[in-house]
């Protein structure tokens, strides 16, 4: 089958032929129709330090996808041939304390699809049936293909009550932009997002941001004054991993504020801990999606009017993958979709 693979320890990916995967007793085989390019895939493409330490070579990658079940293991229940599915990219052990307590998103033995094992940038993907998630007919393939990052945004944004709250989002990547739409959808008052990328800040405006702030030109404090915010933000969603962004968030938070951290800062990042302690801030780390509460929340929000269509900015056939990755690397895109139906 055709697949996008890392064949050598160097930048880039190669469209190549690989062996079709085999289906185990508890697995489903999915014929892939759409995939999306993730920031993780960009790290793999660039072959940065993280990728060099993490990604087996050779291996085909990718973990944002939708497709149709074409084969099932003999023990699989609850699915049928022809079901349209996406899937949870974190394969958990099922036996550690957190798994057995129902907190599978906190499994200490997680294996990542397209990171630690063969991925979805291929004509076919095999995953445990437990990880598959049925997609309702009213949700398009393009939207279903981005359920993985949409889930990151949902898990982060819904970590705290947002109704009537003032929310600061630092980092206008696709996940941060989707978090804007989620926060507004569930009833936040002011949703302010910061970045230095004008293209993506404009996308955030289209997704409902109260203010989209280019911090290279505009002061967050001035924006807060314009919005008559006298006490600071109630909730912070840190999506960038940029230390200066986190610092500005800590300074802008109200006492008793709550922060969810999805962005990954450098290992030795220093912050002013007095901001955390004397303000009584609550900080929560976010990894992946809650299984499967986050997935049900995603579907419910889309069915109740959440519009993510502005984030779907570019579409390519898989044969044009190099142009697709170049578009993502340019910084002037939202989500980039690859069509596998012509593969």
UniProtKB/Swiss-Prot annotation:
Zn(2+) 2 binds at residues 93, 96, 99, 107. Keywords: Cytoplasm, Metal-binding, NAD, Oxidoreductase, Zinc. It is found in: Cytoplasm. Binds 2 Zn(2+) ions per subunit. InterPro entries: ADH-like_C, ADH-like_N, ADH_Zn_CS, GroES-like_sf, L-Threonine_3-DHase, NAD(P)-bd_dom_sf, PKS_ER, Zn_alcohol_dh. Zn(2+) 1 binds at residues 38, 63-64. The record marks 148 as: Important for catalytic activity for the proton relay mechanism but does not participate directly in the coordination of zinc atom. GO terms for cellular component: cytoplasm. Belongs to the zinc-containing alcohol dehydrogenase family. This is L-threonine 3-dehydrogenase. It comes from Paraburkholderia phytofirmans (strain DSM 17436 / LMG 22146 / PsJN) (Burkholderia phytofirmans). The gene is tdh.
